[in-house]
Amino acid sequence: MDKSESPNASRTSRRRRPRRGSRSASGADAGLRALTQQMLKLNKTLAIGRPTLNHPTFVGSASCKPGYTFTSITLKPPEIEKGSYFGRRLSLPDSVTDYDKKLVSRIQIRINPLPKFDSTVWVTVRKVPSSSDLSVATISAMFGDGNSPVLVYQYTASGVQANNKLLYDLSEMRADIGDMRKYAVLVYSKDDKLEEDEIVLHVDVEHQRIPISRMLPT
């Protein structure tokens, strides 16, 4: 070794130089991994957001029709005396009613029994003219005329019955979102007083898709 060459310089010259293009390849791999992760998150988000009426709280339901989605609202009936009735009109969010001409194909009611449930209830959904009230006499007549399906849900020895949903088809009626304020959920407490903390009703309104703003996941 030449005395003029320092030991440090000699060690530096023996260091392995990086191959040409390795830095750019590494950067590309990192970018690809980041893009893959973003796509996985996006796919997961889209999978969650796909419309379906398959809820875990009821049995035998179906997916939404092509081009349709659904909006859910929750109703909690008040205390209902034995042999008495309760009714409440459907009230969808403003973000949905802004598209009042979008067609509605089906209404689905799901009964979610709470731990204290030990009663028998009849549940239905009916079109009620805006001029009509929801008095006990009016609701009683609607349950008896046979013009809409009625779900009879009751406490059983095993706890609660498996079938806890009612599907009301509006396809032939050409109903739209604007018509939903004319529909009401009706409840009849048959055998005893229904307490406030016995059931919750989930109402799924299946309607044509409406424009919504979505953001990519971060």
From Swiss-Prot:
Comp. bias intervals (Basic residues): 12-22
- Residue positions of the PTM N-acetylmethionine? M1
Primary localization: virion
GO terms assigned for molecular function: RNA binding; structural molecule activity
Q: Acetylation: is it a keyword of this entry?
A: yes
For whether the record's keyword set contains RNA-binding, the answer is yes
Any single Gene Ontology cellular-component annotation:
ribonucleoprotein complex
Q: Where in the cell is it found?
A: Virion
Q: Name one Pfam family in it.
A: Cucumo_coat
- Annotated region (Disordered) at 1-30
Name the UniProt key words of this record, in alphabetical order: Acetylation, Capsid protein, Ribonucleoprotein, RNA-binding, T=3 icosahedral capsid protein, Viral nucleoprotein, Virion
What the entry lists under InterPro entries is as follows: Cucumovirus_coat (IPR000247), Cucumovirus_coat_Asu_sf (IPR037137)
Question: Which Gene3D superfamilies does the entry link to?
Answer: Cucumovirus coat protein, subunit A
Highest taxon, organism lineage? Viruses
Give the protein family.
Belongs to the cucumovirus capsid protein family.
Domain comment quoted from the record: The N-terminal arginine-rich stretch does not seem to be the major RNA-binding region that allows formation of an infectious ribonucleoprotein complex.
What's the stated role of this polypeptide? Capsid protein. Probably binds RNA and plays a role in packaging.
Q: What is this protein called?
A: Capsid protein
Q: Which organism is it from?
A: Cucumber mosaic virus (strain S)
State the taxonomy lineage. Viruses, Riboviria, Orthornavirae, Kitrinoviricota, Alsuviricetes
